[in-house]
Amino acid sequence: MYNIVVPDPKFISFQKLELNDLPLMQKWLNESHVHEWYDKNEKNTLEEIIKRYGPKISGEKPSDEYLVLYEKEPVGFIQTYKVNDWPEFADYVGYDDHAASVDLFIGDISFMGKGFGSMMLNKFLKDV
């Protein structure tokens, strides 16, 4: 855990999510500050996380998943996908054929309340 007053965007990077990252995803998805907003109706056992994210990691499902790194240490998660690749979501939000979506969360609570979410989104849009 970090003790940072204001994170520096130059230390933010992204790494494709891999199967060996899923225990960390399970930990984060069960943290109250994440679970309240992200996958809150899902069961977050490791088995369920593997079922949910394994097909995305392997390319069977159309979504790009990344760990967000700060000084090369994982601190969050971001994913992007074309809305029309997920019909149940597309029907819910409405879309055009070119619409994309980005979902993210900060897993390391020490980065909360410091503007890190908008920093990581801006950096992602520039770098990835």
Task: Give the residues covered by each predicted segment.
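Conserved acetyl-CoA-binding loop-helix of GNAT-fold acetyltransferases
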Residues: G113-D127
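Conserved acyl-donor/pantetheine-binding loop and adjacent beta-alpha core of acyl/acetyltransferases
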Residues: Q79-L104, D108-M112
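Active-site rim helix/loop that mediates acceptor-substrate recognition in acyltransferases
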Residues: E42-S63
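TRNA-binding/sensing appendages of the translation machinery
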Residues: P23
